[in-house]
Amino acid sequence: MEHYDWNDGWLFTPVFDPAIVRPECPELTLEPVRLPHTVKALPYNYCNENDYQKLSGYRREFFAPKEWEGRTVLLTFGAVAHDATVFCNGRRVFHHSCGYTAFTVDLTSALHLGQKNVVAVRCDSREDLNIPPFGGQMDFLTYGGICRAVCLDVKEPAYLRDIFIETKAEGDFRIYTATVGETVGCTLQAEIRSPSGSRAFYTGELSLPITGALNSVHPWSIEHPTLYTLTVRLIRPGTGGLPDRVLDEKSCRFGFRTLQFVAGGLYLNGQRVELRGLNRCQSYAYQGYAMPDSIQRLDAQLLKKQLGCNAVRLTTPPSPAFLDACDELGLLVFVEMPGWQHVGDDIWKAQALQNCREMVCQCRSHPSIFLWGVRVSGSADDESFYKRTNETVRRLDPTRPTAGTRSTRRSQLLEDVYAYTDYSYHGRGVGCEARTAVTPDTRKGYLISEFEGAQFPAKSFDDEPHRLAQALRYAAVLNDTIAQQGVAGSFGWCMTDYNTHREFGSGDRISYQGVMDMFRNPKLSAAVYASQKTPRSPSDIVLEVSSSMALGDHPGGFAGACWAFTNAESLRLYRDNDFVAEFTPDRRGRFAALPHPPIEIHDFVGLLLEKYEGIDRTAAPQVAAILNEMRRDAMELSPLSRARMYSLRLSWNELVQLYYKYIGVLGSPAAVYRFEAVWHGRAVRTVVKEPVQSIRLECTVHNPILTDGPTWDCAAVSLRAIDQNGNLLPYCGEAVQLSAEGPLRILGPSIVPLRGGMAGTYLATTGEAGPAKLHCRMEGALDTEVSLTIRCREE
């Protein structure tokens, strides 16, 4: 058994020429590329979706040694978007029509042993293909290229094609295998290795699954995602005194866990899980789908650790690296077959069924996956087609329930779970529809597969009221899905902004529907999710204050509502170092069902009137309440407040003077506000809001240690303009000039504008090791630089 990574040495042409498949093609101009690769890097916005829709070609030359005689040579592509035809030495050897799943090509019969060989790929990324997800309008781009890793394996004529293990939380298991070639007389050996390194061995025949039970297992769960490793060996018994021979072995990680999806929700190992998730688009600025494993894994880390999600919905099968990270982190995954709204003809449907097979067979050993999506998202009912998708998936994996995302009520329910796209909330009233009014069968599971972002997009550079409105809408729907009995949970749309077609988005080819921008910089609405995390240490405390306290950002200079998104026990407010008030979450208010309701900061005066104006202790709170009402309601007073004003013998002019002294700051220096998040009786996080005095460019590298191999590696970089207190400056739109030093190259432009005070870039390795730096320069701020270390993997 030999394994080779095949991600270097490729040549690319953006225009496919049949000559590329020949042994020699000197007439072609080919570009050296490393995988993963996109057929066309796009600008951040105002891109043209026609640019990546093309028939392109890839080529790789290699030497096939004579020692491969009698062996099987397999070439595996992680994904090629979207229709791939593979040639070996001019001969067509394989065709694959899904840009989101892997495929393996048997090169054996086409090889010239002891000679140079050529593999070529005809890559069709045009959107008129009669395969999913194409055929209708799409609110996302589909890109093109060999967008995941490629490897070559040299095996015996008989080998393991697939392994799959079914488990229960108690330790019971059943192992299934699939083989290729002549295996008469062969046996199987299965080895299960625990995280501590202990091993258990089992033997079996090829015709039957291997069954058994492991004692004292640690179940896989969200809080404790314990992973075991299964290794299956295909063994040919020795004859004539010769030892047994291992023909092939295949490994996968798995977890012991039990899933149940019923009318009451999802139960993992017997415990109900309230799903709190986001939808993830697997695309990135400039590169589309073509990003290495470390960047894929980073998305899972952001979802679980930064955003506090326990689940994610994927509308297409993702990179295996993303699923690996979900397994390790305890992030539940709802993965769906490719497609959006459109269902095509019989040829299209046949490919969709094949996509379902590949999705399940390639992903089913991942314990993080809890639900298969077997309907084209948002499509109309199609009984015969969706009966087949359900049957196909249940046959290949009877351990998980099926679901289908739809946007209509009372749709035909052939699946185990009714997944509903609920965009019913418009800022008032109940945040989601009643489950009983939507699903045709209340005995089955129910979840909300999408909400909010498409209904109320928000750019990071929108004004403060708009950004706050989006955040409160997310909070309202999250709250009401929790409050409604029988709703298993919800998935907000969506994690990040993304490039889209001209028919969608804001006219610049971007859908600003994410709680993060395309570079994974958080918007205010991200704090709604992040603040729902259960804190276990002071570093887990989140505090995001919705207002910059700049009254000029609001119509008429009236600031309106101010909210704090926090998982602290309480919030203290100080004005110019004077204590104003302490606030706690309202457990009976609009967001009472949330684990950590956002806190409305409704008092900006407190006892300051008593301290500085000499107003007595009884009257001061009443006057403060009137002033806070004026702040909230643009100087309008309710009849009750007017009556109070007269009873306190205050004139309107006196009230206005107090308002501008303590709230409106007209004619006096702007106040300094300090917000303290209190946890276990002490302040553990502080936010200070005051006029900007200095600007700093903050540069954060999410993965500063890179390893080149088996593909190029990549560092994600976040850029933020912040003030002297670390607050984001959302209206800073300066350009940042980037330059790389060392074995790195910048993906995308070297000059990037800040949008909403934020930007980003990606740094790719070049195949060499060594120290590296990124230099960032912005007018009005000190230059900044960050250091990275690049290593090369030893072969």
Give short role names for the model-derived ranges:
Residues 3-16, 38, 49, 53-160, ...:
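Accessory beta-strand-rich segments of carbohydrate-active enzymes
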Residues 58-60, 101-105, 206-212, 759-761:
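Short strand-edge motifs at loop-to-beta-strand transitions and within beta-strands
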Residues 112-116, 181-260:
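Extended acidic/polar, glycine-enriched regions
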